[in-house]
Amino acid sequence: MSTLHVLSHSPFGDDRLNSCLRLIGTNDALLLCGDAAYALQPGTAPFTALNTRGLTLYVLAEDAQARAIDVPGWATAVDYPAFVELSIHHDKVNSWT
């Protein structure tokens, strides 16, 4: 069973990203959207935490672009139709609100 974890809040405002990383399974994936895209800023603790985990990571392309975030090679930028496909592909979707 796999879960798509969706984060939309800045990793610098609360501990949701760290909580998610503690619970995420090997078959799960993480999608960053909205201000959660700031987790991909190089040189930050969230960037390092995501990079070292080796997890399946997606970011909404338009949210990364709107925040001038370059998507690293270990993450995949997706559009909204791909977000829907990811939601269908996984058994569950967990939105960290």
Regions found by a protein language model. Name each.
Residues 25:
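Short conserved AdoMet
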Residues 37-53:
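N-terminal beta-loop-helix "entrance" segment that forms/cooperates
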Residues 3-16, 34-39:
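Short, glycine-rich nucleotide/cofactor-binding loops
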Residues 29-34, 56-62:
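Short internal beta-strands
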Residues 18-20, 45-46:
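A short acidic, amphipathic alpha-helical/loop segment
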Residues 14, 43-44, 77-80:
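Structural motif corresponding to alpha-helix initiation and N-cap regions
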Residues 67-97:
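C-terminal structural segments of small proteins and small subunits
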